[in-house]
Amino acid sequence: MLEHNLDSHGILHLHPKGALAKEDFASLAKTVDPYIEKQGDLAGIILDVAKFPGWDSLGAMAAHIRFVRDHHKRVKKIAVVTDAKLGDVAEKIASHFVAATIKHFPAGQTQAAEQWILGKG
């Protein structure tokens, strides 16, 4: 399950609460696509996660890959807020596959991540 909200600054906040499902990415697209259509690129994404929860099926993994493929050029920055090793891996490896700048922040540093995305920190 993936809780998400898109704030008034164009920052998409993602909070995985369990294994990711195919429907999570359909719901995410319903939130993000109209914003991109009207406002342009997202300022950023904040992924606030204790540990990567995985996917509930191969279909969910494929939906995740499609979502990234279809949207990564429309996101300027990605902040990964976690104490898990995922943060370091995402910052070093994922940057080769997405257009956004990726930065790792320790758990609890969501406000610092927001400031970085907004160019204030």
Q: What is the role of each PLM region?
A:
Residues M1-G121:
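Amphipathic, Lys/Arg-enriched alpha-helical "gate/interface" segment within cytosolic domains
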